[in-house]
């Protein structure tokens, strides 16, 4: 009997160690089958394509951002229930959206609800899974190559891969993500990853100034070009290691993107404009290129809120083209009565700059009692709208997004 108890105890201990190693430590054995990596989504020139049986079909992203907070709870408590998520998913799909975007790993209830909802619907919702570094780290004194920044970002990337495949235990992650046991594999509905959520421009600028002569990163899946800055090279390295992890552990790939916004857009503005808006940093994902081993592809993602700082409103219409190497047609950005649609014009500039698909991953209008800011040209602001007015602004923004040539938003 004593030997039996010892034997059972040893088996339980080994199972526990194995569980912790796989679900908490990320332990796996490399399959070594690089030529067997699969994907159901890829890019081709400026289009996103989804595999439907044996046919690749263009996919227009009609998305909705989803935060982690509800009234009466801190967003970092991740307090939304499965039942609430299921109700929201139904409403979101009825509104015409086909994609969700979340900023970080949500609570296990989200992935359980997402799995359950899609398993019961012929037309699924897709997911763009975000990964971030928290604001405390981004606004600290360190540059992006400090372990508290680069190391934490990479850790979050690898944890996120395990989460969407239903193989992760998160005990404590400094509020960067929720916690819990993730057992639902939702990977077949995950279009891709968006790394970052609005990089702090001063951190980007500080990193680039500190390492002006850094050798560009050369990876297996992603490579930084000779023109890449130090921060862009860090992004290439992070994305490359994330792709390696998913490719070798799960034999899968999906799209990848590095978030940006107008504070870090790739354009070189006139001196007076840059000084007025305190524009100090640039991120150009065209400086991050894919190798043949990255079969899914990249897309460019921008926060494109209509009330954000509007460089074009301070520039003459005739000077907009000075920001591009191409001759861009902005004629439909001027109404018959002479009003300028600087929102559409800026999005077109972004789209024409890139060789990859471009998504506006964050835009909208709020219904709060007070208005924080308003675009002086388009009169689209943040707050003080009725729900009807809010809906009209959302429709107008989306029409501008598609008219500018983006792949959705």
What are these model-predicted stretches?
Residues 1-16, 20:
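N-terminal Sec-pathway targeting helices
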Residues 15-34, 310:
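Membrane-interface motif at the C-terminal end of an N-terminal transmembrane signal
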Residues 26-119:
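Active-site-adjacent substrate/metal-binding segments within catalytic domains
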Residues 74-92, 272-291, 388-398:
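Short, acidic/polar
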Residues 79, 101-112, 263-267, 307-310, ...:
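Acidic-and-aromatic substrate-binding clefts and catalytic sites of carbohydrate-active enzymes
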Residues 85, 111, 153, 157, ...:
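Aromatic/hydrophobic pocket-lining residues that form the small-molecule binding cavity
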Residues 120-334, 348-370, 402-408:
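Active-site region of glycoside hydrolase catalytic domains
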Residues 369-379:
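Histidine/acidic-residue-rich catalytic or RNA/ligand-binding cores of hydrolases
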């Amino acid at each position: 009997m004593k030997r039996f108890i010892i034997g059972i105890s040893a088996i339980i201990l080994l199972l526990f160690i194995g569980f912790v190693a796989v679900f908490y430590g990320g332990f796996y054995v490399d399959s070594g089958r690089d030529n067997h990596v699969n994907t159901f989504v890829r890019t081709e020139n400026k289009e996103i394509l989804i595999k439907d049986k044996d046919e690749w079909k263009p996919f227009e992203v009609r998305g909705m951002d989803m935060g982690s907070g509800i009234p009466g709870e801190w967003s970092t408590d991740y307090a939304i229930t499965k039942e609430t998520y299921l109700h929201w998913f139904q409403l979101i799909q009825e509104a015409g959206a086909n994609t969700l975007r979340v900023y970080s790993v949500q609570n296990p209830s989200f992935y359980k609800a997402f799995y359950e909802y899609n398993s019961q619907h012929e037309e699924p919702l897709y997911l763009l899974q975000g990964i971030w570094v928290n604001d405390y780290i981004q606004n600290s004194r360190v540059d992006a190559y400090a372990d508290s920044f680069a190391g934490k970002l990479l850790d979050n990337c690898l944890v996120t891969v395990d989460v969407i495949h239903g193989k992760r235990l998160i005990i404590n992650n400094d509020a960067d993500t929720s916690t819990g046991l993730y057992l639902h594999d939702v990977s077949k509905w995950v279009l891709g990853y968006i790394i970052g959520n609005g990089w702090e421009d001063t951190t980007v600028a500080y990193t680039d100034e500190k390492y002006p002569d850094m050798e560009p990163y050369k990876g297996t899946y992603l490579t930084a070009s000779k023109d890449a800055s130090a921060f862009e090279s860090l992004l290439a390295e992070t994305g490359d290691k994330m792709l390696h992890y998913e490719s070798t552990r799960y034999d899968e790939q999906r799209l990848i993107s590095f978030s940006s916004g107008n504070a870090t857009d790739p354009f070189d503005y006139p001196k007076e404009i840059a000084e007025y808006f305190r524009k100090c940093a640039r991120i150009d994902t065209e400086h991050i290129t894919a190798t043949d081993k990255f079969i899914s592809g990249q897309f460019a993602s921008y926060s494109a809120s209509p009330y954000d700082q509007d460089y074009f409103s301070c520039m003459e219409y005739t000077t907009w083209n000075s920001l591009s190497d191409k001759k861009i047609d902005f004629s439909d950005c001027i109404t018959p009565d002479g009003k300028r649609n600087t929102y559409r014009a800026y999005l077109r500039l972004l789209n024409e700059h890139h060789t990859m698909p471009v998504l506006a991953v964050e835009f909208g209008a709020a219904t709060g009692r007070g208005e924080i800011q308003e675009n002086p040209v388009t009169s689209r602001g943040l707050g003080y709208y009725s729900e009807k007015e809010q809906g009209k602004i959302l429709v107008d923004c989306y029409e501008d997004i598609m008219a500018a040539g983006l792949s959705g938003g």
